[in-house]
Every structure is written in C-alpha cells, then in structure tokens.
Amino acid sequence: LYFHTDASQGAGQIDIHPQRLGVDMMTLNAGKVYGPKQVGLLWAASSVALQPLIAGGGQERGLRSGTENVAGTVGFAKALQLAVAHQRGEFARLSRVKQAFLSTITELLVDEVMILSPRKGCLPSHVSLSIPGIDAERVLFLLEMKQMYVSTGSACAANKGTRSHVLAGIGLDDTAIAGSLRITFGRYSTEETAKRGAQLLAEVVRHEQQRQKSRKWGAQ
C-alpha cells in the first residue's frame, strides 16, 4: 500500500520534503509557485514500481513517452527554487495578510460568518468559511462583478455539482455547505487588499440578505 500526497498548495510555504513527510509519492504543480502553466512533477520513492501509461518513444526513463516540455520543466525548477528561497518570509507575510482578512470579516459579519479553517496548523494562503443561509454561487458571481475572485471549492471539484463530502465529513449541514467559500491569497496580495476583499464580501452578503428579505415580504 503506497501513500501519495498532492502537496501543490504547500510548495513555497511549508516544508514538503517527501522523505521528511514519509510519503511514497508526491505531486507538485508549477502554477502554484508562479511557474509555467500545465507543468507538473511526480516524485516517487525508489521502492515504488511505476508502470507507464503512455507507450512510444520511451522518454522520461520509459515512464511517460512523448516530447518533453524542456522549457516548462526548467521554468518550473527555477520557480520552485525561488519559492523555497523566500519561503520563511512569505509564510510570515501571508500570515499577516490572512489575519487582516479574518479580523475584518469577523468584525463586519460577526453574527453570520463561520471560519472553518483552523487558526493554527493551516496554510497562510487559504481561508475556508461559510455564511449559512447565503447561496455561495450567487456570492461568487456578485464578487466577480466587483473584480474579486473566490471559489466554492477546489478546482478539481468545483464543477461536480454535488455538495462537498469534506465539509459534510466535519459535521456541516447542507445550509452551511451551500454557503461555503474558499478565499486564497498569493504573492501579490497585501493586507490592504485583504481588508478590502473582506469589505466587498460583507457588502455582497448584506445585499443578498436584503434580497432574501424582499422576496419573503413579496411572497407574503
């Protein structure tokens, strides 16, 4: 039985050395460290007997045939090198950015917002929250109109049209899951933009609450 981890989100923020983590396989994504898009990495321990899925020219030690993206691979290596070199400072900076967002949103939506991310042991670039009773898909659309971009889940699960089994697994009901959002911060995020983002989110939530009240009054 092999243990694989997708450590893409942690690259450049925390120590993801595969041998220190004790994993058998690890994948990384160049885009997460501001490298070339559509370039990935698979690390496998020597004890893992990988079998090729693509036959042909025998590139990449016979494991994945096809012309290699040399420029993309070199770019990925450099981007990862730079991310690791600035890891400690970036972790501290993003922690301040995240705290600025959390302080602002919990002040503006003190009675509405549920912060799902743990305060400790969590990446500084991510916040998971829920506003029960609000349709997160509508919030996402309204925020896009204000040029603020968030998500309702991971990119690989966003289009499945089903509720998050992860949020259900930690005990959230359907109302809380339907109101869940994921906010991420990056290299170009600042404490000021984080505060402004929290303000925009609060404005949209207030707008939706008022819309719901108007619909209820209209129905009566």
Language-model features: locations:
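Pyridoxal 5′-phosphate
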Residues: 1-220
